Amino acid sequence: LPITQTGGNALYKGDKLLKDEIANRDPRLYATIDTAELRLPSVASVYAASGYFANRFANPTLIGKSGGKSFTNITDAPVMKLNEVMMNYIEAAAELATLGKYTLTQTDFDRTINALRQRASTNMPTLQLVGDALRVPAGVINDSQRDADVSPILWEIRRERRVELVYEGLRFNDLRRWKKLNYADMVKNPKLNMGAYVNKREYIKWYNTVHPAAKPENTLTKEKMSKIQLVLLNAKGEYEVNDSVGYIRPIVKQDFMRTYSDK
């Protein structure tokens, strides 16, 4: 069950430490977040502002090999993967169902989301269609953070899409399609400006172990959990959504002229 649902995941340890945040969660989270510090030698000091490095399309078999020391990524980049096709299908089916143009069945989920969840690398509970909701063995999914204008079924399909296709360049267009760019509004969602929590004492202990040649100064007098925040240079640095123009994309001038000249 979602960690945002009351009594959803009793094994969730919170998000103060990375090892706790990814423990007892969807295995795809652990598989997505880089915990091995995979870096090119010449950019070893580059870090993610969010505090999370992704390892999608990073090939661990190239560690220590010439291909892993090059700025050229030789990992194949798929144009479209089967999981995207499956997620497109189940979302379209659910949208048609809300319009009364289709009737969702358990088979729809078994052929798409459940097939993905049953992969050996994922091994997540399958979703069961129960009326207007979905359930897993632990109970009916009822996320308290669900938007009122989104059905429980569609909400979970969108969640699954986000998990399956994270870091694949699809999220922005998904939010536009759903008219949910407000999720990325840093004024309405100030938490988006926050980085990762850092336990100073534990970080220094880890750093001194991994990098014995370079030790940061330890001037702490007591253990304290601190938050590192991205400080914006000015208010205009925040991404704020304007509904009147945020969903509009202009036609390229050359295409516009070509269209009319062809006629």
Language-model segments: residues:
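Acidic/polar-rich alpha-helix caps and helix-coil junctions
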Residues: 3-263
